[in-house]
């Protein structure tokens, strides 16, 4: 069967003008005009999609099939062009019968030309073929326009769905034009309104927690630049958290003398029940000479230093992908779960804006993976946000998964982010050693986002940076009061 592209070539019908006219009509539709006014960042993203639309329309016209009736009429027309005038006169009754049988628009005009002229001259022969060709051109143009109109309706429907999705997610995920473009590309998937409303919900939660968004911005761009202090610059106060040995209940390290009743050795506690030794017990208690368990660990204190305010010689640093590990244990449920998911959404926003990859891993008893910056990023984000945090804590598996992924060439400059309350067992020595090797030899940076003030320092000491967001009731009330 004849294709429409072949028919256009045979009749010298140009579809380019019709395609451009259809694109302009689509862009001028009221739906797109209103959308562009409301979301100007997405206008460039939609405009960048125009070449793909043109190519899709050309492909549709190229592959379309011509109806059998029109194909038969075109074949008859081509054969008639090869006939001389005497031969054409002989074939004329069959040609008229074929036009009548095919219900050709040229039938009435063909009969009029033959019946109104008693003699069929060569000039009439030429006129007959010219008008027949003109009729075929009109039919081909009409067929092109019908197909383009069908495609326009389908394209407008698809664009409206993507506009609705992109418009809903633009406040949450599109920070700049680059992010808006990537968001528009992601919107090409098959999503329903109820699906992406989950992202809108967590976006609203993130907007209600500006400190969490600010923390994600600081972490996401903490590698952006390196500054060299300028000489004789004014100084400013700079506060950092430093580790130091402290007596915190992390591990038993031996025996010491003291007055801590809760950590008394059983023999010392037994003397309290002997009448003759009771006063001796109190004397040693006052003098802090009772034998107690010695528990050592690490604590954090705030160190105040000064640094220059003015900087120069900014050296841009490479910004690689994010590998984000999220603790899905039972202790991370409730408000912690909301904060962890919203924080990942904020990192996705940073990744889209800076053209970076954002890879999420959930660690509990198993490791589940999502890539939020790929072509199916929106679907992946919805699946991630739909997860429930009800498992156990296996932070060692999380680190092993990070280490394995960082072996790939495409992750050579990745930053690892671990979101947890860090209430877990100590890390195995081999994991600690491998993390240190990645930090030392490959300049990988490991960030901890601590959702609790009670995380074990023994676990957190391996991180380059610790970002604290206490989700306790007291801290939540203080943050709300400060706003």
From Swiss-Prot:
GO terms under cellular component: cytosol
Coiled coil: none
NCBIfam families associated with the record: PRK10997.1
Record-stated family: Belongs to the ViaA family.
Stated role: Component of the RavA-ViaA chaperone complex, which may act on the membrane to optimize the function of some of the respiratory chains. ViaA stimulates the ATPase activity of RavA.
Subunit-structure text: Homodimer. Interacts with RavA.
Protein's name in the database: Regulatory protein ViaA
Organism of provenance: Salmonella agona (strain SL483)
Higher taxonomy: Bacteria, Pseudomonadati, Pseudomonadota, Gammaproteobacteria, Enterobacterales
